[in-house]
C-alpha cells in the first residue's frame, strides 16, 4: 500500500525543471549537505550538478511530503532491474520518525514502478562512506539490508584518499511488499 503523504515529481530536462534543480542545488549549498552528498568531490558547481543529475540514465525526483518540498532523490547506474539510489532530505524534515517514513515510502514507491514487462526494479542499492553511519543506518531503518563493507569503495575528497564503503540493498521482500 502506497503512502499518500508522498509525492515524487520526476525532473526531466525542461527549462522549468532545470530551474527546480538549480533551486535544489542552492538549497544543498545553503543547508551544507552538498559535500556530504557528493563526498567524492565531483560536484563543485551548479553546472556540474545539472550535468550529473540530468545525465542519460539518471532518474531524478523532487520529493514532497504532505504537500511540502521535503528532499530530492535520484537513481542511476541502472543495470537490468537494479539501480543505485541517492537521497537528500531537507533540514526541515530531519528527524527519526519523519525521515524513516519518507525513506520507506520512497523505497516502496520506486520498487513498485512498473511498465509492460512488470517491475522496473527488483533491488535498489546504496553505497555510502562507512564512517557516515547516519546515512547507511537510516537506509537499514527504512527497510534495506546491509550487504557489507567494500574496502576502499569510495573516494573521500575531504581526505584525498579512498575509504571503506558500506553497501546496502532494499527489495520488495525486505519491505514486506506482497507481489
Where in the sequence are the language-model features?
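Conserved beta-strand in the GNAT
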Residues: 62, 67-77, 84-86
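A short helix-loop-beta-strand connector motif used in the catalytic cores of GNAT acetyltransferases and
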Residues: 48-62, 71
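Conserved GNAT-fold acetyl-CoA-binding loop/helix
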Residues: 30-48
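Conserved N-terminal entry element of GNAT/NAT acetyltransferase domains
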Residues: 1-19, 174-179
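Conserved catalytic-core motifs of GNAT/GCN5-like acyltransferases
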Residues: 127, 145-162
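Conserved acetyl-CoA-binding loop-helix of GNAT-fold acetyltransferases
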Residues: 96-112, 137
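Conserved acetyl-CoA binding element of GNAT-fold acetyltransferases
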Residues: 76, 80-93, 127
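Conserved beta-strand-loop-alpha-helix junction that forms the acyl-donor binding cleft
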Residues: 120-140, 153-154
